[in-house]
Swiss-Prot record:
PANTHER family: 30S/40S RIBOSOMAL PROTEIN S3, SMALL RIBOSOMAL SUBUNIT PROTEIN US3C. Gene3D superfamilies: 3.30.300.20, Ribosomal protein S3, C-terminal domain (3.30.1140.32). GO terms for biological process: translation. It comes from Bacillus subtilis (strain 168). GO terms for cellular component: cytosolic small ribosomal subunit. Pfam families: KH_2, Ribosomal_S3_C. Keywords: Ribonucleoprotein, Ribosomal protein, RNA-binding, rRNA-binding. SMART domains: KH (SM00322). This is Small ribosomal subunit protein uS3. Binds the lower part of the 30S subunit head. Binds mRNA in the 70S ribosome, positioning it for translation. Part of the 30S ribosomal subunit. Forms a tight complex with proteins S10 and S14.
Length: 218
């Protein structure tokens, strides 16, 4: 089962948290569509800003949005001009008061979404799929990952028949719930069609039990 299911979804409530944090009764569908619109708009507008994920919280008529990015300067802009323009655009999109927080990602090579996007951009620039994957795996392992696996699917090298090729290094224990595994997908638009990119990064185990810590402290 661990081999098939989305590793992030499997760990929600165990070591991962939800990216949308709100409760709704009859308005659930409306809020869900609004979240999708917000994420799609931010993804398009900040496509070059290395945005990893967008967290959304709601309270009454207010929406708090947290943007995780490796390039905060590009999102904020000179004197905060870009983030203010983004806030106004999201205000009109949702019809609610929007507050935006920017969080910087210190190590981009340990973030699965940024790694997948980077491989996809290289494929669009006609870099060999083998070279793109191997170089990125080396960078991720040097950044401190305990294991990484990448997969590219589609008409690789312009072949007539689509196939998948994956490369891995270290260990990626998909079944271990306490294993901090980051997973993401991306797409590359090439002259031969779309190529799909998947990335798994094992960053070590989390959830050290309190009892062990207390015993160690004694």
């Amino acid at each position: 089962m661990g081999q098939k299911v989305n590793p992030v979804g499997l760990r929600i409530g165990v070591i991962r948290d939800w990216e949308s944090k709100w409760y709704a009764g009859k308005d659930y569908a409306d809020f869900l569509h609004e979240d999708l619109k917000i994420r799609e708009y931010i993804s398009k507008r900040l496509s070059d800003a290395s945005v990893s994920k967008v967290e959304i919280e709601r309270a009454a008529n207010r929406v708090n949005i947290t943007i995780h990015t490796a390039k905060p300067g590009m999102v904020i802009g000179k004197g905060g001009s870009e983030v203010e323009a983004l806030r106004k655009a999201l205000n009109s999109l949702t019809g609610k008061r929007v507050h935006i927080n920017i969080l910087e990602i210190k190590r981009a090579d340990l973030d699965a979404q940024l790694v997948a996007d980077n491989i996809a951009r290289q494929l669009e620039n006609r870099v060999s799929f083998r070279r793109a994957q191997k170089q990125q795996i080396q960078r991720t392992m040097r950044a401190g990952a305990q294991g990484v696996k990448t997969m590219v699917s589609g008409r690789l090298g312009g072949a007539d028949i689509a196939r998948s090729e994956y490369y891995s290094e270290g260990t990626v224990p998909l079944h271990t719930l306490r294993a901090d595994i980051d997973y993401a997908t991306s797409e590359a638009d090439t002259t031969y069609g779309k190529l799909g990119v998947k990335v798994w990064i094992y960053r070590g185990e989390v959830l050290p039990t309190k009892k062990k810590n207390e015993e160690g402290g004694k």
